[in-house]
Amino acid sequence: MPDSQKISEKQSEYMNLIAEIMDIRKRGEKPVAYIRTYGCQQNVADSEKIKGMLEQSGFEFADEPDNADFILFNTCAVREHAEDRVFGNVGALKNLKRKHPQILIALCGCMMEQEHVANRIYKSFPFVGLVFGTHSLHHFPELMYNALLDGKRVFERGNDDNQLYEGFPVKRDGTFKGWLPIMYGCNNFCTYCVVPYVRGRERSREKNIIVSEAKNMIESGYKDITLLGQNVNSYGKGLSENVNFSQLLREVDSIDGDYWLRFMTSHPKDCSKELIDTIAAGTHISKHLHLPFQCGSNRVLKAMNRHYDRKKYLEIINYAKEKIDGLSLTSDIIVGFPGETYEDFKETLSLIREVEFTSLFTFIFSPRVGTPAAKMDDPIPAEEKSKWFRELLDVQEEIAAKRCSSMVGKTEKVLIESENDKSGELCGRTSGNIIVELEGSKDCIGTFQNVKITKARNWILKGELVK
């Protein structure tokens, strides 16, 4: 089997057929699509492919669903809260479908790869006409055409041939900040995580394709490019070419231009000294490492099936601190894993204090159907977990304030990303992914600016443009 395969010309034919159907229905007016994406950046990248295919089918895009001809929710299965939001928002479309029967409402993404979810959609949401999972993206036009053709519901999930498809048209959401997938799937099977079940096994894209896409993005003016994968440190496994993630990172970094290069997500068990050395020596690589540790207790890490311990994690963190000047460290933490005690939780707090992260993405454990952790005994009450969660936030807030305060008086290179609608202030990020707010012209958006840091407020910096 080749490393990758192009989506078929047949799908381009289906895009043309969709355009013909919509042209008849709309009597020459442009059809409108509304896409809402939940979850991770990998979902954002998938939605950009879907938008690319819809654009080739003649669609324009709306920010609200009210006047759309096609409505699609790209869903996330990582936490219960995201699933609840999807069900609530889909239910709210019932009246819209009643008023406009020709609207096609569709759901895709990770939730749709779960049998119990697909069954619930089929039984409880009869106005949803198209459902497909993460493994069906390469023939989305065919599925959509079939749903439009006779109005019959189309449901497809679990069609994983472990093949990786290339050649998608892509309509990116941003013009200066972009996502570049380098691999899909995960082989780690952490006991709490549903990703391997809904995204499949690891599949790496060919290096020359990734480098070519990165070069095109840089030449098109992209200033901040993030290489994406569920575990980027596993990149290259299974490819016919002998290549690893550090080698790929160095090759992309060698492309001329004024840009930052980021990546996510790294798994501590595969995070090597070679990768740290590559970041340290890089020209464009952001001095930011996101390395999820999830829990500071070895006992809990073993129950999570993380394949590293506290000592191994701290060894790679300390090596990174030693080698990379101005390193910004961020991480993910799960609070209240089944069987976790307050003594275990205190080990998490001590690790946070020892490392001094710039920021943390912290979540209370959310059981996922089909994972081993969902069947584990979980005696700690939700109220107790919430108490631990607040304690952790207090500790991290103090650390973040200290780290940000140390930057006051320094001048930082900042990518200006947006304008605050209420305050009129500009908002940007440093290479270390720290938010900076400042006064300035909207013309600065999408450009790098030198900013003197004048004030720190918890994890946000205030600054002023250096003329």
Where are these regions (language model features)?
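Proteins enriched for Cys/Gly/acidic motifs involved in redox and nucleic-acid/cofactor modification
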Residues: M1-Y235, E274, L289, K311-E322, ...
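Terminal RNA-binding accessory module
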Residues: P2, K375-K467
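Radical SAM enzyme [4Fe-4S]-AdoMet core and its adjacent flexible, acidic
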Residues: C40, G236-G257, M304-H307, P367-E398
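Short, solvent-exposed loop/turn segments at secondary-structure boundaries
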Residues: A82-D84, R201-E206, G236-N242, A303-R306, ...
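Conserved SAM/AdoMet-binding glycine-rich loop
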Residues: Q102-L107, H116, E219-Y342, R353
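Short flexible coil/turn linkers enriched for glycine and charged/polar residues
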Residues: D173-F176, C186-N188, I285, C295, ...
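Conserved, mostly hydrophobic/aromatic
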Residues: C190, I210, L227, F263, ...
